[in-house]
């Protein structure tokens, strides 16, 4: 017997409206495709010479039939067939509950986003990806556990954020790819073609007023449709499990898993803010000011997007949807079992080093003692590693892969830039070391409350 009903009549009926909206969206896209996209090449078998809109007309018809099936199939939810099968959900849960797979997937997705930008910014490709994600969302809503996570009032804005961020990223890359092509062909930039001045009053003010009214209406309907996520007064004898920070701090909360509070909660956020403020002063490339581009500022854009997507947005998604009770990893269709316990046998770098088979027989394992000299000897491998990372890497980078940047920035600006980049890289490095080797601290000095 299942632990809960995956589908009820009200859920099926609600999904019927959801698919009806998708049908209307694709009906509009069919009309747009008929006007814009033309026909398939005559060289393509079976569909050669056929309007491209025919494909979207078929998609619209399928979505309409799915919507009708939901409206007419509410009498017996147990036998309703349009749902995700277990053979699909189980592998997804298995792999998504693995942080290594999740992080590697986010890195691959980031790389594909940059490398294949000229492909996915095309209208038809982007629309196809949007529809696939919406259909996946609708099918996933047939699972009770997924629905509980996504439909939680606290998590609704996270789902909206994913689509909004994706849309804004698409807008940027679409304009950047277009301008890169214009620069190569010697044509005027997109921003230079329509640069007519617009009056603040009434043009700009009217536009802002309309946006204000629409956003106010959205917030009103949001407040009516979703209950405020208010909980009972805080109690020292009852702690929520999981106890999560607000969504905009989930990235920092995830960092607390891998670093001490002083580092994850104070130093790293301070470096992030300081780095953002330092960007105008260390940036030597004046290209790309006032217009979208990618190729002229590829390194700077990739660096920023790497910090924004894999190291921030991905951590918010991870903390929202994949972290459950006891801060364990759960799949998106998995039951959040409070009794699930995963033993963690984390060790410090000093234990790895001094217990190495060759060294342990000579020195007798990790040095014991609480005096300063013993502590420094014990943590010498980590101290040397961290010192070498921040002291030796900037010159090495400046003489090799970033030689051009050293020449154009100068020593001072380059060392500021390289150290900021090294601090940004330390988060994924520490995450991978924890997952691969169960490494807790590179430098662990609990006697001084100093751990890295």
Regions found by a protein language model. Give the residues of each.
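Soluble extramembrane regions of membrane proteins in the secretory/endomembrane system
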Residues: 2-7, 86-92, 147-153, 182-187
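Hydrophobic cores of alpha-helical transmembrane segments in multi-pass integral membrane proteins
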Residues: 12-38, 49-82, 93-144, 154-179, ...
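Intracellular loop-helix junctions on the cytosolic face of multi-pass helical membrane proteins
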Residues: 183-202
